[in-house]
C-alpha cells in the first residue's frame, strides 16, 4: 500500500520549517498540519521517522529532549509538527507546567490542525499525559489516532489483548474521539495503516479511499 500512498513521496521532500517555544511563534495558521505527541520514551520520534521515511525527528536515549514545537514543511500547504515529549521524571516541573499550558493552547486554537497522532507505549498505556491529550482532543473535537508503539515487545496475542483493552477504555471514557492500532517502528508493523490516516488528514486521498482501522 505504501507504494500507492502519496504521503510517502511527499514526506521525502520534507524540510525543517521552524521551532516555536509558544503558540504565537508558530507558522501562519493556514493549510493543513498533523501533530505527533507522546509521553517521553513512548517512541514518538522513531514513529515519526518511520512513517515519513525520513530523519525528521531527533531520536535520543535521553527522554524529554523535544522541548519545542518543531514544524516540518511537506509542501506549501501541508506540515507535520513534532510536539514536546514532556513527562519524564528528569524534566523540571516548571517546564512540564509551561508545556502543558502551551500545548493546550496549541491544540485548542490551531485551525489548520487536522489531527494528532498519539504514541502510547503498549506496555504502559493511558498515562496521565495520554489521558490529558484525549481530554483536550475531546474538548476541541480533534481526531486522534493512537499508535500503540513497541508492539514487538509483546507476543502477538498479548499485544492484541492490550489493544482491545485500551480501545474499550478509550471508547468508554472519550467516545469516538480516537482510533487505535498496533505499531512497531523496528518491525515496520502498522506503517501502511498509519500512513493512510496521515494521508487522509492531509487531504491526499481520493474520496473513495478510506483508512481501514485495525480490528
Swiss-Prot record:
CDD domains: YihA_EngB (cd01876)
UniProt cofactor(s): Mg(2+)
Keyword Transferase: no
GO biological process: division septum assembly
Alphabetized UniProt keyword annotations: Cell cycle, Cell division, GTP-binding, Magnesium, Metal-binding, Nucleotide-binding, Septation
Pfam families attached to this UniProt entry: MMR_HSR1
GO cellular component, one term: cytosol
InterPro entries, sorted: G_ENGB_dom (IPR030393), GTP-bd (IPR006073), GTP-bd_ribosome_bio_YsxC (IPR019987), P-loop_NTPase (IPR027417)
EngB-type G domain: residues covered: 30-204
Binding residues for Mg(2+): 45, 66
Domain of life: Bacteria
Residues that, per the record, bind GTP: 38-45, 64-68, 82-85, 149-152, 182-185
PROSITE patterns, alphabetized: G_ENGB
Molecular functions per Gene Ontology: GTP binding; metal ion binding
Stated family: Belongs to the TRAFAC class TrmE-Era-EngA-EngB-Septin-like GTPase superfamily. EngB GTPase family.
UniProt function note: Necessary for normal cell division and for the maintenance of normal septation.
UniProt-listed NCBIfam families: GTPase_YsxC (TIGR03598)
HAMAP family linked to this entry: GTPase_EngB (MF_00321)
Record PANTHER family: ENGB-TYPE G DOMAIN-CONTAINING PROTEIN, MSS1/TRME-RELATED GTP-BINDING PROTEIN
This protein's name: Probable GTP-binding protein EngB
Lineage, broadest ranks: Bacteria, Pseudomonadati, Pseudomonadota, Gammaproteobacteria, Pseudomonadales
Protein encoded by which gene: engB
